[in-house]
Every structure is written in C-alpha cells, then in structure tokens.
A protein has these predicted regions:
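N-terminal low-complexity or simple alpha-helical regulatory segments
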Residues: 2-141, 167
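Extracellular-loop-to-transmembrane junctions of the mid-late helices
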Residues: 11-21, 129-140, 146-179, 235-238
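Short, Lys/Arg-enriched, Gly/Pro-containing loop segments at transmembrane-helix junctions
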Residues: 136-137, 189-193, 262-270
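C-terminal transmembrane-bundle signature of multipass membrane proteins
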Residues: 213-281, 292-295
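The DNA-contacting recognition helix of HTH DNA-binding domains
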Residues: 321, 371-373
Length: 392
C-alpha cells in the first residue's frame, strides 16, 4: 500500500473514532439509565435525563455521518440532526426542571421542544420531495460549503431553514443557560431554608455544570456559525470538541445516577411536616420569634440533632415552619442551613479544645453532622481553616 493512501486511511479511522465517541458515550448512558429505571423503579428526573441522552445520541450520530461524509445516509441523519440540534439544550433544561419544579410546571415546559419539532419536520419534508439530483447537490456541495445562497429551488429553501435554525439555536442556548441557572439557584435556596444537612440534596455540581455548559455553549454557537465542515478535515480539529463533550457528558451521566434527592422528595417531606404545623399568632413579631428560636435551639441544643429540619424547630415552638424560616433569614440574616451549621462548628471547636483525644469522626458525629465530608466542608467554610489547624 502506498504510504500516502495508508496515511489517509489512518486519518479516516481516527476521524471516525473521534467523531463517534460522544455518540457512544450518550448511547451508553441511555442503556444504563434505562436499566436503572427498570430495576430500581421509575424516577421522573432520570427519565428526563435518559431522553436528553437519547436526543444527544441522535445529535452526535448526525455529526458523525456529516464529518465522515457518509453521503448516502445524509438525508435521514441530517433530518434527525435538524431536530436534535434544537432539542438538546431544551431537553437539558427539562432535566433540570424535573429536579427542581413540580409535575404540573414540567408539563408546560414541553412546549420548549416546539422549534426543534417544527424544523425537524420541515427539513425531513424537504428531503422527501427533493429530486435525487437536488439531494446530491445539497448534500455533497452546498451543505459542506454552507453557501446556502448559491442554491436554487428547494436547495435554497433548505438553506434558509438551516440559517433560521442557527439563529434559533443561539437564542435557545442563552435562554436555557439563564433559566436553568435561576432554577438551580432557587432550588438550592429552598433546600438551605428547610434542611440543616444539605449533603446530597443541593444541586451544587449542576450549578458548576451550567457554568461549564456556558463555555461549551459559546463554543457551540461559534462552531454552529463557522460550519461543521471545518472540523472534518483532520483528526486534530475533531479531537478537542469530541473529547471535551464526551468527558462532560460521561461525568453528567455518572453524577446524575448518584443524585437520588429531587423536588419530589422535598415536596413529600414538606407535605408530611405541614400536617403537624400550627400557625404563628398574629401578635408575635419576627424579631420576637427570632429570639425564641435562638433560645430553644441553644438551650435544647437542637442543632446537635442529625438531619434536623426547620419543621423540627417549628414543632418545638408550636408555630409554622415558614415563619421560622423567614425569621431566621430576615432577623438573623442567614439561611437555616448556615444558622444550624455555624452552631455545630462552634460546638465542634469546643469539643476539640476540651477533648483533644477525640477523633475527628467522633467530633463530627457529636456535633450533629451526618458525614465527615459535611463537617470538613462547613468547618473550612466558617473558620477558613481545616480542623487540624484551628489553634494555629
């Protein structure tokens, strides 16, 4: 074999592997989440994640076919790409929404997929009524050069649809990132206002994912307007976006399977606690309530209870959890979680100084923390030091 031909085959193989990697990562998580749903029972958030990964699989299958110039498969996979390219970010938002919003709100957000469905139908319809010559011209020449204005007839119409899809994509990305970040922030604040132990409940990692996806989204918009064809000439141009998105999607799937607490659990616990709450008398001010909260929490050392909730404090005061949470926020100036954990850290420091023989595990447990990780994280947060350096 001629060295030049061998080098070309090597490049083609590398292109195929790299361009298909994100597709296989997403397909892997579709299978894993489906098995999890079957054996562990249905979970709304994971179902939405599975649908997101399925859409992403179609998206990267379209990329793979395009970048490897599989011309005969282009009409089918380009139609799927037209849909999935505009459905991926809305589906990710639906996944975030399923973890942070009620079922009734989630039903309304399905309309966010409307642009993807409309564009997908239009593109597939145009391919269906195109002549073989027009399809060949569009697939082999116009779509790779992205010179949509040079086409005629249906090729020109397809070009306008493609350009409109790019505009819609950019709008979707910005909308999803802003709305998704707000959803996560609002949800985390609700968790902090209700629970002292927020480990495994807050969506901290997902907030970071939104920041990372912001950077990727900017790259996506740039790639979208530059044209996919620019990344198919060399394995090196495919490698960076392929490995980046493959890694992010794999990490997202891994973390998501470990996230067991969602809005469904929160709403259920709220409903159970609401049944034993009583209303605060109108004559008691927030300042007066804040003083009573401080007294009962300090005197009875309620902060030492594992998994203590704002409803537990409300029950001790014979009042409503909403009033307790509001009084802590407005009068004490912190969230319920920070209020309790600050007291736990102060108590832990006393234990460390009066009982130097105690292990950190014992100190964490006796201070009310449900895990070592939570203890170390809060200790560092409130003191700026690790437990071993507190006296330095």
């Amino acid at each position: 074999m001629h060295p030049k031909n061998f080098h070309q085959q090597e490049n083609q193989m590398a292109n195929l592997i790299l361009s298909s990697l994100p597709m296989f990562v997403c397909g892997f998580w579709v299978v894993m989440i489906a098995l999890n749903q079957y054996f562990d029972g249905r979970n709304k958030a994971r179902m939405m994640l599975m649908l997101f990964m399925a859409v992403a699989t179609l998206l990267y299958a379209g990329h793979c076919v395009f970048l490897n110039r599989f011309y005969s498969n282009m009409p089918l996979f380009d139609s799927l790409y037209a849909f999935s390219n505009l459905a991926a970010y809305p589906m990710f938002y639906l996944y975030i929404d399923s973890m942070t919003s009620s079922e009734s709100h989630l039903r309304r957000t399905w309309w966010y997929l409307a642009p993807a469905v409309v564009i997908g139908i239009i593109v597939s319809t145009i391919y269906t009524i195109m002549s073989p010559h027009d399809i060949d011209t569009f697939v082999r020449i116009i779509s790779y050069k992205e010179d949509y204005g040079s086409g005629t007839g249906l090729c020109r119409v397809m070009g306008f649809v493609r350009f409109a899809a790019k505009i819609i994509f950019a709008i979707e990305v910005v909308t999803v990132l802003v709305a998704g970040s707000r959803k996560i922030t609002a949800y985390n604040k609700s968790i902090e206002a209700y629970y002292a132990d927020t480990e495994g409940k807050r969506l901290v990692v997902y907030q970071w994912f939104m920041y990372v996806f912001t950077a990727c989204a900017v790259a996506s918009i740039i790639f979208n307007f530059l044209g996919r064809y620019r990344f198919g000439d060399s394995p090196w141009t495919i490698a960076i976006p392929s490995l980046t998105f493959s890694s992010l999607l794999y990490i997202l799937g891994f973390i998501s399977l470990r996230q067991t607490f969602t809005i469904e659990n929160f709403v259920q616990e709220e409903a159970e606690d609401a049944s034993i709450s009583e209303h605060l008398p109108d004559c008691e001010s927030k300042n007066s309530l804040a003083q009573r909260i401080e007294e009962v929490v300090t005197q009875q050392q309620l902060f030492l209870r594992h998994n203590v909730k704002v409803s537990d404090i409300a029950a001790e005061l014979f009042t409503n959890r909403l009033y307790v949470s509001t009084a802590i926020n407005d009068e004490i100036g912190v969230s319920f979680s920070d209020y309790i954990n600050k007291k736990r850290i102060d108590y832990a420091i006393q234990l460390m100084r009066t009982n130097p023989q105690m292990t950190m595990y014992e100190i964490a447990a006796r201070s009310g923390f449900s895990s070592d990780k939570s203890f170390y994280r809060n200790f560092k947060r409130f003191t700026g030091k690790s437990p071993k350096k507190i006296d330095e």
